[in-house]
Amino acid sequence: TFHKPVSGASALPHIGPPPHLHRSFAATTMLSKLQSISVKARRVELARDITRPKVCLHAQRCSLVRLRVAAPQTEEALGTVQAAGAGDEHSADVALQQLDRAIAERRARRKREQLSYQAAAIAASIGVSGIAIFATYLRFAMHMTVGGAVPWGEVAGTLLLVVGGALGMEMYARYAHKAIWHESPLGWLLHKSHHTPRTGPFEANDLFAIINGLPAMLLCTFGFWLPNVLGAACFGAGLGITLYGMAYMFVHDGLVHRRFPTGPIAGLPYMKRLTVAHQLHHSGKYGGAPWGMFLGPQELQHIPGAAEEVERLVLELDWSKR
């Protein structure tokens, strides 16, 4: 899952040994190579460095420290570094085997989490979509005028507010994300779970989906029973908020944070821009911007240097490493 601290000076995680380790020329050369190969290739290259004869103990330690990239913050990775400090080749081999198991377990756990969230997302999407379609049909069937004439004024009001509700939610999300979710202590109490590593398929921040769904339910219920243009407009606004929430879940949770697979849509140019724009939000590099979701790239265009960085990160984006 792509989570980064709120405060940070870079959009990408730091790659390098701890500051107290001296960076020798050999270690620096090795680290530069690591940035251009996959995690699996990193591990193979580093394992060769560790077991290669005539390599100084310090280089072995640096190599083992770099292995923490593959399984950060795990007991196995910490044990690997401790084994390197002992300078024992056998201990290093054992630690590498432990790291292999840690990587396999981590991948299996992530797969289970993705399947759990995907099942919940599919069930919610099908259920909400079915209810919305059926409720729309019932509303206009109930309020048709005598003789069966279609109330075109109400239909137009509903369609306009569907679009308006969705666009309005993007503006509201930009405001709420900054003022409520980050700057408000109560909002941050839930939202901070989204900016820290997650250990399960769900996080406290997911409660905002329910909270933001309440206005949509109220508007749809009120507009469903009110037989005039105002009722049609309220019904449409509720549908627009619902549509925005479903799209937000697909793009934010699925595409950006990889909580479930999204298929080939991830390769679309604008979807890549949405991804790296939200990545910059998690980095905190531009004061937390962008705060919006679907217009995040446009929000960054007003910040000096941000638009150029978005284009650079789009070119560097590699889904196989995420």
Swiss-Prot record:
It is a multi-pass membrane protein. A motif (Histidine box-3) lies at residues 252-257. Keywords: Carotenoid biosynthesis, Chloroplast, Hydrolase, Iron, Membrane, Metal-binding, NAD, Oxidoreductase, Plastid, Transit peptide, Transmembrane, Transmembrane helix. Residues 164-286 form the Fatty acid hydroxylase domain. A motif (Histidine box-1) lies at residues 177-182. InterPro entries: BETA-OHASE-like, Fatty_acid_hydroxylase. It holds the Pfam family FA_hydroxylase. It is an enzyme of class 1 (oxidoreductase). Its EC number is 1.14.15.24. It is found in: Plastid, Chloroplast membrane. GO terms for biological process: carotene metabolic process; xanthophyll biosynthetic process. A motif (Histidine box-4) lies at residues 278-282. It comes from the Eukaryota. Induction: Up-regulated by moderate light in correlation with the redox state of the photosynthetic electron transport. One of its GO terms (molecular function) is iron ion binding. Residues 1-68 form a transit peptide. The chain crosses the membrane at residues 118-138, 149-169, 207-227, 231-251. It catalyses: all-trans-beta-carotene + 4 reduced [2Fe-2S]-[ferredoxin] + 2 O2 + 4 H(+) = all-trans-zeaxanthin + 4 oxidized [2Fe-2S]-[ferredoxin] + 2 H2O. A motif (Histidine box-2) lies at residues 191-195. One of its GO terms (cellular component) is chloroplast membrane. Belongs to the sterol desaturase family. PANTHER family: BETA-CAROTENE 3-HYDROXYLASE 1, CHLOROPLASTIC (PTHR31899:SF9). Nonheme diiron monooxygenase involved in the biosynthesis of astaxanthin. Hydroxylates beta-ring of beta-carotene and catalyzes the conversion of canthaxanthin to astaxanthin. Uses ferredoxin as an electron donor. The histidine box domains may contain the active site and/or be involved in iron binding. This is Beta-carotene 3-hydroxylase, chloroplastic. It comes from Haematococcus lacustris.
